[in-house]
């Protein structure tokens, strides 16, 4: 495949990533076969569900005692002010939190592969373009769907998905657009 097409398809995957309603990470994936896009996907909640992909995970009161301030801000990067009131007074408190992805969120790759099945298309011999490297579960789906090559943009902290694909003799290539 020509380099300019590879860049164009990866840019398309990045464009679909912007459709994600997730706040932590936007991921897009497209499946290409015979020089045409046959499926797209991005991370998000199942069809018909609300679009809130994350829960707030609040810092426990004990955590402040054993972590220095820099570690607290790194682990719980967000804060919000909450008004607490009783019958006689009200006051504001700051609470730190991090965003935790809900278990129900579908990954971009699994969404793209599910759409293939829904439309009666085959992934056999296709190429997948993903904005981020796939997790292990998505890599299993990629393998089972018959996709022969994967291009990805950013590496994710867990490389087990890439290792699985390579073990299955699926070509994997990281590209920067």
Regions found by a protein language model. Give the residues of each.
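Zinc-dependent deaminase catalytic domain
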Residues: 1-177
